[in-house]
Amino acid sequence: RPLKIGSFSAASNVTGILSNTCAIADLLHRHGALSFWDFAAAGRYVRIEMNPPDVDSVSAHKDAIFLSPHKFIGGPSTPGVLVARRELFTNRVPVVPGGGTVAYVNPEDHAYLADPAHREEGGTPAIIEAVRAGLVFQLKEAVGVETIRAHEERLLARAVEAWRAEPSIEILGNLAAERLSIVSF
């Protein structure tokens, strides 16, 4: 049967409106599709859970998440991050073969590493950048999602109040929807 993938943004990078990732993931899985999520806009503001612990449905999990830590506080020069369920990595040949992906080689034969985390990371890794990405996530965790969201919501409320008073500004999107402090007008 054909592979079905649903790939959505956890939040709009235009309006800041949040997606109900658990409900959408559940719907996708009930229809035999994989659930892929882009957290580029939402990642720095929300809790990122592959398997949300507070959800009743076992099919509300995410199969893959894409992150952009360079958008986080302290994140410039960090690499993009892919978090995916191990069973999705079934190809025994790496996408980009290179140094560090081969377990064995001789003139007649070769074998790639069995562990996809190592097999798919050919070449010289961006060590400093990866460490920086880890520190960015530690900073987010130390400050706390609730603190970040509360501060951002206060700033958003002030901005929206001022912009609504200006008749020549039209704010895009549903202002009553759960949203991040991202606004287009």
Annotate each predicted stretch with a short phrase.
Residues 1-185:
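Pyridoxal 5′-phosphate
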